Design a protein with these regions (language model features):
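Hydrophobic alpha-helical positions that pack around
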Residues: 198-310, 316-321, 331
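N-terminal, Lys/Arg-enriched amphipathic/low-complexity engagement segments
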Residues: 2-51
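Gly-rich Lys/Arg/Thr-decorated short loops/hinges at beta-loop-alpha junctions or inter-strand turns
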Residues: 110, 137, 160-174, 295
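Ferredoxin-type iron-sulfur electron-transfer modules in oxidoreductases and energy-metabolism complexes
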Residues: 349-365, 375, 379-441
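Conserved hydrophobic positions within beta-strands
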Residues: 81-83
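Acidic low-complexity segments
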Residues: 85, 90-143, 152-155, 210
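Short, well-structured beta-strand-loop connectors
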Residues: 53-66, 85
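Histidine-anchored nucleotide/phosphate-binding helix
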Residues: 179-194
């Protein structure tokens, strides 16, 4: 941690690919008349429980499934129409999940929302409205926001950090939100700060986004408790641990939560959703998705109704160029390849990347040459090659002894490896094995 230069040790510099969509304003994408799919697990924790049945008519913004436990989240319909079925459907991850299927009638009849003024808000009202709206972390993890804002020791929270780094290559949705709706992002942060008595706000933005930094500095000029911190452009600067260390100098490990270091981290779109839910009274039924890559004709940033089919996202961007080689949900470093586009956009869907053949690497891995580049790139100061070796031998003891469970699966080691070894994938698989074995005990 170096004062005046917000960064962390390790990381890498992948080609950022943001020129495809960074200058494209957010465009609203109305869903086509027809089937909308709402999975009951769009968040970390217990699946939501349906409160509608087949044949029911629902309005846009209506609650269709309620939180199934303390760590869970409400789900609302983004459209008006009739419930066709409640059945398992495939997700972008490839897994199946029980889902509510609604036939969109194209009329978008909405429920009535109850707005509130900032001055009238109390801590309990803020948390209740966030919970009622089903707001979750929208950077991908999907942790319920009301739970994150209810730590065991609220007096210990010193900082609420807005993650505006957007360090994943190609993604530009947070950048566009900061440019176009800075006032609402600032208001969302002020609402979150109101829950804690002495917390300060930090908005971290990578220094390759000077326009966003300038706009947010102007938007916070009269806010003494909020500071905009330019971050050194490096991947994974937006990782929770890296961001906390870069902006505050505080370090956390896998046995700690950010709250243990006095910090709470929120994605830009999550903070925007806090504003929408608390001030305007609207539930989380839409999100921004970046559709980009050399495999689409017109890359852009779209404000998408949840439940919309990914195929419609591709059509909104002008359709594919030729025969794309690969579709990815999320970023190229931590996202996952998709085998089908017939899956719904959910709360954590940040993007659809479409790549042509010459961008997709098809190289074969070779033997490790002991160069040490993976260790230099690891933001957690691990030895990825050694951990991957333990994983390949299924050596759980060695893997945990050398802190394999501290891996944040950012992909930096695999990216820099000259032998093209799938280090992240091997470590990730071993982590899953260790966690599964711990649950058995």
């Amino acid at each position: 941690y170096v004062m005046g230069k917000c960064t962390f040790k390790g990381g890498c510099h992948p080609y950022d690919g943001k020129e495809f969509s960074k200058d494209k304003p957010i465009k609203e994408l109305f869903p086509a008349v027809g089937e909308m799919v709402f999975p009951l697990s769009q968040h970390i924790g217990a699946p939501a429980k349906p409160v509608v049945a087949k044949g029911d008519y629902v309005l846009a913004g209506q609650l269709i499934a309620e939180a199934g436990g303390f760590v869970s989240a409400n789900i609302h319909s983004s459209v008006s129409g009739t419930v066709k079925a409640i059945e398992p459907r495939t997700l972008a991850t490839g897994g199946k999940c029980n889902s509510i299927i609604i036939e969109n009638d194209g009329e978008f009849k909405e429920v009535e929302y109850t707005p509130m003024k900032f001055e009238d808000l109390t801590k309990d009202v803020i948390l209740e409205r966030i919970k009622a709206a089903g707001v979750v972390g929208m950077g991908g993890a999907g942790f319920p926001t009301n739970v994150k804002l209810s730590p065991k020791n609220p007096e210990a929270i010193d900082f609420i950090i807005v993650n505006g780094a957007e360090c994943e290559p190609y993604l530009t949705s947070d950048y566009r939100r900061l440019l176009e709706e800075s006032d609402k992002v600032v208001m969302g942060l002020k609402i979150a700060l109101k829950i804690f008595d002495h917390a300060k706000g930090i908005i971290g933005i990578e220094d390759n986004k000077p326009e966003a930094i300038r706009i947010m500095q102007e938007a916070t000029a009269s806010e003494p408790d909020i500071e905009v911190k330019p971050l050194k452009t490096k991947y994974p600067q937006g990782g929770e641990r890296s961001l906390i260390y870069a902006t505050t100098g505080r370090a956390i490990n896998s046995s700690m939560l950010p709250a243990d270091a006095g910090c709470i981290v929120h994605n830009v779109d999550t903070i925007f959703s806090i504003y929408l839910s608390v001030i305007e009274g609207k539930p989380l039924t839409k999100r921004i998705c970046t559709v980009t890559g050399d495999g689409v004709k017109e890359p852009g940033n779209f404000y998408v109704w949840l439940g919309t089919n990914y195929r419609q996202l591709l059509d909104a961007a002008g359709g594919p160029v030729g025969e794309p080689e690969k579709y990815i949900s999320g970023g190229p470093m931590m996202g996952f390849a998709m085998y089908s586009l017939d899956v719904p956009v959910v709360k954590g869907s940040s993007s659809l990347l479409v790549f042509q053949k010459d961008i997709v690497s098809k190289t074969t891995s070779s033997a490790c040459i002991r160069c040490g580049k993976c260790g230099e790139a690891c933001p957690e100061h691990l030895l990825p090659a050694k951990l991957a070796g333990f994983a390949s031998r299924n050596d759980e003891e060695g893997f945990t002894k050398f802190d394999g469970m501290e891996c944040v699966m950012c992909g930096s080691c695999s990216y820099v490896c000259p032998a093209k070894r799938p280090l992240t994938q091997q470590i990730k698989a071993m982590r899953s094995t260790v966690l599964a074995n711990r649950r058995k005990k």
